[in-house]
Amino acid sequence: MMNRTTPDQELVPASEPVWERPWSVEEIRRSSQSWSLAADAGLLQFLQEFSQQTISRTHEIKKQVDGLIRETKATDCRLHNVFNDFLMLSNTQFIENRVYDEEVEEPVLKAEAEKTEQEKTREQKEVDLIPKVQEAVNYGLQVLDSAFEQLDIKAGNSDSEEDDANGRVELILEPKDLYIDRPLPYLIGSKLFMEQEDVGLGELSSEEGSVGSDRGSIVDTEEEKEEEESDEDFAHHSDNEQNQHTTQMSDEEEDDDGCDLFADSEKEEEDIEDIEENTRPKRSRPTSFADELAARIKGDAMGRVDEEPTTLPSGEAKPRKTLKEKKERRTPSDDEEDNLFAPPKLTDEDFSPFGSGGGLFSGGKGLFDDEDEESDLFTEASQDRQAGASVKEESSSSKPGKKIPAGAVSVFLGDTDVFGAASVPSLKEPQKPEQPTPRKSPYGPPPTGLFDDDDGDDDDDFFSAPHSKPSKTRKVQSTADIFGDEEGDLFKEKAVASPEATVSQTDENKARAEKKVTLSYSKNLKPSSETKTQKGLFSDEEDSEDLFSSQSASNLKGASLLPGKLPTSVSLFDDEDEEDNLFGGTAAKKQTLSLQAQREEKAKASELSKKKASALLFSSDEEDQWNIPASQTHLASDSRSKGEPRDSGTLQSQEAKAVKKTSLFEEDKEDDLFAIAKDSQKKTQRVSLLFEDDVDSGGSLFGSPPTSVPPATKKKETVSEAPPLLFSDEEEKEAQLGVKSVDKKVESAKESLKFGRTDVAESEKEGLLTRSAQETVKHSDLFSSSSPWDKGTKPRTKTVLSLFDEEEDKMEDQNIIQAPQKEVGKGCDPDAHPKSTGVFQDEELLFSHKLQKDNDPDVDLFAGTKKTKLLEPSVGSLFGDDEDDDLFSSAKSQPLVQEKKRVVKKDHSVNSFKNQKHPESIQGSKEKGIWKPETPQDSSGLAPFKTKEPSTRIGKIQANLAINPAALLPTAASQISEVKPVLPELAFPSSEHRRSHGLESVPVLPGSGEAGVSFDLPAQADTLHSANKSRVKMRGKRRPQTRAARRLAAQESSEAEDMSVPRGPIAQWADGAISPNGHRPQLRAASGEDSTEEALAAAAAPWEGGPVPGVDTSPFAKSLGHSRGEADLFDSGDIFSTGTGSQSVERTKPKAKIAENPANPPVGGKAKSPMFPALGEASSDDDLFQSAKPKPAKKTNPFPLLEDEDDLFTDQKVKKNETKSSSQQDVILTTQDIFEDDIFATEAIKPSQKTREKEKTLESNLFDDNIDIFADLTVKPKEKSKKKVEAKSIFDDDMDDIFSTGIQAKTTKPKSRSAQAAPEPRFEHKVSNIFDDPLNAFGGQ
């Protein structure tokens, strides 16, 4: 070709430069002597062309070879086909030959023999044929008599039987049920099958003796009689029989005269048939006892059969058999009326037992045993039989989804077992009577409600049917089976602890949430081991019970709300919506959950790592994930605190779980920085929340309520959660720190009553109140934290929490905020300390005090809680105003109300809201949006809240509360108004602030003003509005939104926050928080925790410094934040401008404090992880943008959620890191301050701290701080030291562990290094990730 081209090229040269065309070999040779650059170019062209030709030629050859291979393969295939054809032919011929040989041989021989026989015996044969024919006829008649019932159309026309043909023509033969005399064995797997060794086959002999033998004997005797009589006195027997049945068969007596063997046999047959026929007609017109018996039996059988079909699809065959058996028994009864009458009585009795559920025979019963058994299943709830049937259907449908996934126990067995285990314990105390029908017994009490709830429970009986909740609880427990006994036990305990229905419902939700978590998270984590761990966690079922006994009160209160939750449970079953159903904690959510489940599952698939965090959305998931971080944090804390009063067994189990989860989640964490934020948070809450959940509930609870609420909102609110999480988280944190501080104070009052501990109860009450109160309260939060806290309890708590308690939590928060608001200064601590005074000192009393909650606190605490819940309406207005109207503005206005309660909350909220003021207008729509992401957060927890407007308000308030810890202070009130609007993302103002500032540094914050909208994604905000009740809807969206929107909103809102933070209290605490943010873009990026702490400290500072620094409502701000929070407040102001200096100062404090208060940073981290899982996801979304993004720098986790988790955990990790580094320590302290300021943060931190403190010192002060959120400044120092003591190791170990799988302890120092070193890069990453991750969080939006 070249030679070809060469001449052309040589001809062409004149027209084009020589160097632009490939040269030919000849040209190259010619110019070899006078080589030039053009020759080089030509040579290059030549070589390139040569290469291309070689490649193309190679491809051609390759194609040819491929074609050859294909042809070879096709040839081989055809060859094998031919072989196979030959083999088939050979086999066929072989078989045919064998068959033909045999056939040929036999016919020939037979034919010959027959011929000889025929020839010899034709006459004889005829003679012989007569008896043979007679015998055959007799046999045939016997068969007709024995195997067929003759429906005698001519029952009255037996005269016409004279014409055998006519009689036969008119005869209608109905085959008898062969299985009356010889019943089939029971259905395999049925109760009777399991219980009886003969599986219904051996009972034939026994029951045949009575019934079967009567039948058999009757039929046999009848047949024998008929044979004998037909041979001998067929007419006589007919006469006897007909004399017996004379009334029945007066016409047949005429036929009795016809005594031909065949006529008699036929008559006998017809008589029998007539008798049977008459019996049947008698059934319609029962004239004789046999008829009545038959009719009655038939009725019973029909009733049974009818029942059976409803109860047992498999029973359908049996009902037929039963009917046949009944018919046949009736027939024998009719055939031998005297004998039959006695036996039919027996038969009738048997039938009546059968009808009554005994079964014709035990075997018959076996046939119907399932029916009867199922009837029995529902028979105990016989009222519920229909309910049972529908329940079974529901259970089957829902259970399979549920049970199969995690528990994967048989739907029925699982349910029965789960409910046997779960419901039996539930039944155990309240429902023990109905243990036989575990499922039903839960249902049994409200059988109608069962179905109403079951059917409507998902949607209609959301709130109306706690009863069905039990059924669903059973289902959930079957689902809980996933958590097998744990949740089953939880449910048992819960059912016992709570009103069985309510608790069960709660359990269901928990189970669902937990299953979801366990499923989604445990899928990674080995749900079974996790379940086992959880079970171990709830091996202290008393505690679970206690949690739920207190929750039970909450559940009782929230029973109607819980039913809404229950729908979640239902959805839980429906979902594997579950994941959504967690969110669909509301009944309607089920549908929403389906959508969200799809959404979220898709998101989970795509954001599986992220959406492990998203999985946090599922309270269970988030709880699991949270629990692991909480658990991990709590693991360290718990391992440290194992010996502490907190249930060591539970702790250890939970720790084991936490350990599992830690490692599991550490994997997830790395993967799921987003998810880890949630995953770790989930982990944190799981392990931490499991034990620390309440302790961590303060933090994890906060984080977790944020997680729970945010987890609900997590995926949605991960994007939109910055405000919602900020709000929800911060609000939740602050609500939980503030509100929950108040709530805990109220709840502490409750839980003090419950737990009766003020000091330890304070520190632990933070955790335990958070557990118990927050379990109660945060049973809504349970979704977020209490659930994680008690994973087993979590289902309970969560269930209680999800619909009820989050709402309750928020309502309680609000109520506590309102009432405790008032109480906070006066009543919160009093409420909390008197009641929590001694209780928390015994950590184990946590659970036993939860039991106390059932016992003592139920009245007081729940009086408090109930008050809180009663306050809920006002809280509704509180939250309604604050959250609905004033996510940003009403929260401002309301903050006054809320401010008291949420002095911390609202201060933070104010700060957040100030920062969020830009978003405020957005959050006007966003309020509901963010609020609703909050509500999705609440979705888990607020599902109950859904019933209340506060749900959205709560979301808002939680968003506000996220900020509100500062707002909780009176001073913060004004700030709240100012600040609240500014920061949807500043809902976790500090964190968000820091984030914002960090984002400001990395100008991603411009959208921060719109972050609220961006967070919520107004559409989702609208969804969230309805999400209150159908949180699932929002959650599906919210998760992605939370991440994407939160990140975008965190960027924009943070920038807006950074801009708006300076003003008003935000400038105050935003100085602390934002300067930390501004300072923390790096620091916060490096140490998102510190930023969060600083932000929290800053947030705490306003209410702390502004409202009552001494009262520092947030325990964090109090103990840590007070020393550091005041510094943060003012240093935060300085931090705002001199954030580094302030942070350095703060950090130096924190260094000392963090050195002292490793627990504090860990608590901060934990709080942050709890806070920031939700709050931290909001805040850490800013942090995501900063700390989490620095974490991306660390982990290069693209997902803000992961980063958020990292950030959350970076806050925590960074707190640890910062604990290591003074700047970061300052941030940590600030974060802790913020956490202290943020009741939510404080509680979040405190729970970690508490967990650690409890674990280390049973930090009563933490809870005191929580209780003294408003008045606990004094306790704060204890918290500090305890935080110092515990936080470091706990935080380092747990938080790092929790938040960074690999970064546990090492992360603390590496993190501080990487946090400071990578703060800006991370922040840059986060900024990029803010947009990238949010898009990713949104799935590419």
From Swiss-Prot:
Q: Where is this motif: LFa 11?
A: 803-817
Motif LFa 21 boundaries: 1330-1338
Q: Where is this motif: LFa 18?
A: 1234-1240
Q: Where is this motif: LFa 20?
A: 1290-1299
Q: Where is this motif: LFa 1?
A: 367-378
Chain residue ranges for the region called Sufficient for interaction with CCDC93: 356-600
Q: Give a single Pfam family match.
A: CAP-ZIP_m
Q: Where is this motif: LFa 5?
A: 537-548
Name the segments for region: Sufficient for interaction with WASHC3, WASHC4 and WASHC5: 1-220
Q: Where is the composition biased (Basic residues)?
A: 1028-1046
Where does the protein end up? Early endosome membrane; Cell membrane
Q: Where is the motif named LFa 6 mapped on this chain? A: 572-583
Q: Where is this motif: LFa 3?
A: 450-463
What are the Low complexity biased-composition ranges?
A: 202-214, 1094-1110
The yes or no answer to whether the keyword Phosphoprotein is present is yes
| Composition skew (Acidic residues), residue ranges | 220-232, 250-259, 266-276, 451-462
Q: Where is this motif: LFa 4?
A: 482-491
Q: Which GO terms describe its molecular function?
A: phosphatidylinositol phosphate binding; phosphatidylinositol-3,4,5-trisphosphate binding; phosphatidylinositol-3,4-bisphosphate binding; phosphatidylinositol-3,5-bisphosphate binding; phosphatidylinositol-3-phosphate binding; phosphatidylinositol-4,5-bisphosphate binding; phosphatidylinositol-4-phosphate binding; phosphatidylinositol-5-phosphate binding
The segment annotated Interaction with phospholipids runs over 937-1339
A GO CC term assigned to this protein in UniProt: plasma membrane
Q: Is Lipid metabolism among the key words of this record?
A: no
For the motif LFa 13, what are the positions?
856-862
Question: How does this protein assemble?
Answer: Component of the WASH core complex also described as WASH regulatory complex (SHRC) composed of WASH (WASHC1, WASH2P or WASH3P), WASHC2 (WASHC2A or WASHC2C), WASHC3, WASHC4 and WASHC5; in the complex interacts (via N-terminus) directly with WASHC1. The WASH core complex associates via WASHC2 with the F-actin-capping protein dimer (formed by CAPZA1, CAPZA2 or CAPZA3 and CAPZB) in a transient or substoichiometric manner which was initially described as WASH complex. Interacts with VPS35; mediates the association with the retromer CSC complex. Interacts with FKBP15.
Annotated function: Acts as a component of the WASH core complex that functions as a nucleation-promoting factor (NPF) at the surface of endosomes, where it recruits and activates the Arp2/3 complex to induce actin polymerization, playing a key role in the fission of tubules that serve as transport intermediates during endosome sorting. Mediates the recruitment of the WASH core complex to endosome membranes via binding to phospholipids and VPS35 of the retromer CSC.
Family per record: Belongs to the FAM21 family.
Q: Which protein, by its recorded name, is this? A: WASH complex subunit 2C
Organism whose genome encodes this protein: Homo sapiens
